[in-house]
Amino acid sequence: MQGKVALEEHFAIPETLQDSAGFVPGDYWKELQHRLLDIQDTRLKLMDAHGIETMILSLNAPAVQAIPDRRKAIEIARRANDVLAEECAKRPDRFLAFAALPLQDPDAATEELQRCVNDLGFVGALVNGFSQEGDGQTPLYYDLPQYRPFWGEVEKLDVPFYLHPRNPLPQDSRIYDGHPWLLGPTWAFAQETAVHALRLMASGLFDEHPRLNIILGHMGEGLPYMMWRIDHRNAWVKLPPRYPAKRRFMDYFNENFHITTSGNFRTQTLIDAILEIGADRILFSTDWPFENIDHASDWFNATSIAEADRVKIGRTNARRLFKLDGA
């Protein structure tokens, strides 16, 4: 399929590059560094070869979210966004941008999002999970009350917010002790991000801000296949504390969330996602450079779904969500 839009596609700046070192074998690190720092060469050639018209680029993980010093987090976020704006300006026909945000400081994050959207032309934000602040030992999740004004501005700006994974903090990772192969994208990423998303749903955030659009990668971090059970079991909870939100989890998932195919190239999983959340809320992505563009594109081009759904997932859903056709 030609003309695809891909939107979980990462880059790095020198200050954040090392954050990605632990996710690949040592002998692949040199190649990954090249892939993360390159935007205008290898990346574009692969896009051309595999029918990707547009990439929406975002900073690698955890980057800004793992900088406990507020001032430093603000500085790195701003620098990354400025670098990305310069790169996108070289090929505005091919590249768009997600803002990195220093959510250690909700006010600063709000100001940076405003700057990126209003002044730099960014189409949304991608944030790498919870933020660390102060001593770095307490994860800040975005259902907390101090983030409500930030979410109000996201809704006002009418741009999507991509909640990208990161590993849990060491003190919250004891279940993985002795089992490091379960950390990262194998399992811990999905578990951490799914719980964060469920906290957002349960908090009443989407009752207050019903026009928010949240994106989850990796075919929804496992959530599409659990929503019925989550609601079914919560229906049995008759005693307080009940979760604060007014509606079922499934209602928020179906109305406020979108999912991407990033790093999860399995036809059966895609078909199940279509049945659960609908083809209108699924978006093609590759997860470059941690996955290969050819693997993602070759699978998607041939996967056994209706051609109308392929066009939606591969192109038109993203163009509508990000208003790329002036909508």
UniProtKB/Swiss-Prot annotation:
Secretion signal: which residues? none
What is the pH-activity profile?
A: Optimum pH is 8.0 for decarboxylation. Optimum pH is 7.0 for carboxylation.
InterPro entries attached here?
Answer: ACMSD, Amidohydro-rel, Metal_Hydrolase
Gene3D superfamilies from the entry? Metal-dependent hydrolases
Name the top EC class.
lyase
Q: What controls its activity?
A: Inhibited by CuCl(2), monoiodoacetate and diethylpyrocarbonate. Inhibited by 2,3-dihydroxybenzaldehyde, which is an analog of the substrate 2,3-dihydroxybenzoate.
Chain residues that bind Zn(2+): 8, 10, 164, 287
According to the UniProt record, one GO cellular component term is: cytosol
Q: How does activity depend on temperature?
A: Optimum temperature is 70 degrees Celsius.
GO function terms (MF aspect): carboxy-lyase activity; hydrolase activity; metal ion binding
**Listed GO biological process terms:** secondary metabolic process
**Binding of 2,6-dihydroxybenzoate, residues:** 23, 164, 287
Report the cofactor remark. Binds 1 Zn(2+) ion per subunit.
**Which UniProt keyword terms apply here?**
Decarboxylase, Lyase, Metal-binding, Zinc
The record's subunit annotation is: Homotetramer. Dimer of dimers.
Q: What job does the chain carry out?
A: Involved in the gamma-resorcylate (2,6-dihydroxybenzoate) catabolism. Catalyzes the reversible decarboxylation of gamma-resorcylate to resorcinol. The reaction is reversible, but equilibrium greatly favors the decarboxylation reaction. Also catalyzes the decarboxylation of 2,3-dihydroxybenzoate to catechol, but does not act on 2,4-dihydroxybenzoate, 2,5-dihydroxybenzoate, 3,4-dihydroxybenzoate, 3,5-dihydroxybenzoate, 2-hydroxybenzoate, or 3-hydroxybenzoate. Only resorcinol is carboxylated by the reverse reaction.
PANTHER family per UniProt: 2-AMINO-3-CARBOXYLMUCONATE-6-SEMIALDEHYDE DECARBOXYLASE (PTHR21240), AMIDOHYDROLASE FAMILY PROTEIN (AFU_ORTHOLOGUE AFUA_7G05840) (PTHR21240:SF31)
Please identify the protein, giving its name as recorded.
Gamma-resorcylate decarboxylase
* Origin species: Rhizobium sp. (strain MTP-10005)
